[in-house]
Amino acid sequence: MQNFTVSEHEKLNTAVALGFFDGLHKGHRRVILSAVEQKKNGLLPVCFTFAQSPKEVLGKSSKGALMTTEDKLKTLESLGIEHTFSPDFKKLMNMSAKDFVEKIIFGNLNAKFVVCGFNYHFGKNGEGDTDLLKKLCDENGTELKVIEPERDDGDVVSSTLIRSLVSEGNIRRANKLLCSYFGFSAVITHGKRLGRELGTPTINQKLPENLAVPKYGVYASAVTLENGKVYCGVSNIGVKPTVGGTKLLSETWMPDFHGGEIYGQTADVRLLDFIRPEKKFDNITELKNAITDNAVTAKEIFDEMYRYGV
C-alpha cells in the first residue's frame, strides 16, 4: 500500500474513507469497504486518517490505542485500501471545516465519493459534522455515504466501548467487535528465567507505547514467531508480583515450543480470552502449578478460537 501524494490528484479520481479508525472494528470496516467497493466505478480507494490520534493531541484521551499504526496499515491493505493519506494532525487542526473539505478532500485528494461514520467530525474544534459534509459534497457534485451505527447486544460498536472491554479483561467480546485479535508485536527480552521452572522458555515483552492496557491477568494467546510458526501461549499481562516485579510486562509461556534461543527476535502475541486475574503466589512452585493448569485451559481456547476463528 502506498502513501497518497498530493500531486496525484491531477490524474486520479478517488473514493475517500474518512476517520481515525482505531482498532478497525465492525463499524469502521463498513466505512472502509464502502470506499473499496467504488473500485468497480473506476475510483481509487483512499483512506484519510491522521498519523496521531486527534484526541491524544488535544489531551482528551489517555487510555491508549487498540492497535499500532503498523497493524492499522496492514489491516487497511488487507481490506482493499490501496493508498493512505496521513497528514500531521497538528498541521491541520486549526483549519476550518469548510477549508478542510474543499482544500484537502476535494482539492488534494480529488474525491468523487466520500464515506464516513455517522459521528464523524472535522475542522477546527471539530466544528464540521455530517450535515455540513453533505452540503459541501452536494455543492461539489461529490457523492457522500454516511454509515449508520453498528450495534452489538444493544451497544453501539465504538473504539471507546472496545477499550473498556479490553480494560475489563473481556477480550473475547473485544475480539468479536474488532473482527480480529487484540494484541501486539514486540521484541523478546530476558526475564527472570521462569521458563526454566516450566521446562520450556517464556518470552518477556514490553507492551508497545500507547497501546491500551488489558486487565492484569492471565490470557490464552496465540504467538507467532519470526519463522511464521504459531504456538498456543499462556500470557501474563501485569507486574509479576510473585517474583517481585513492579513494571508492566507481558510474559508468555508456550508449552509446545521447543525451538531453542529466541531472545532478540520479534514475536506477535494475540490475546484470545481471559483466564484469571494476576495473583501473588506464596512461592514459585504454586505459580508453576497454576500456570501448568492455565495451559490446559489455554490449549482448549486456542483450539476453539484461533484455529477456527473468533
What residue spans do the PLM features occupy?
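N-terminal catalytic cores of NTP/NDP-binding nucleotidyl/phosphoryl-transfer enzymes
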Residues: 6-68
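A short acidic, often aromatic-flanked loop/helix-cap motif at beta-alpha or helix-coil junctions
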Residues: 9-12, 91-94, 151-155
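Phosphate/ribose-recognition catalytic cores of enzymes acting on nucleotide-derived substrates
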Residues: 13, 191-310
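Residue-level signal for inorganic ion chemistry
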Residues: 25, 76, 114, 174, ...
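Residues at the starts of beta-strands that form the adenosine-phosphate
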Residues: 42-46, 82-83, 112, 143
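N-terminal Rossmann-like or analogous alpha/beta NTP/dinucleotide-binding catalytic cores
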Residues: 56-118, 122-139
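Glycine-rich, Lys/Arg-enriched anion-binding loops that position phosphate/diphosphate groups
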Residues: 137-238
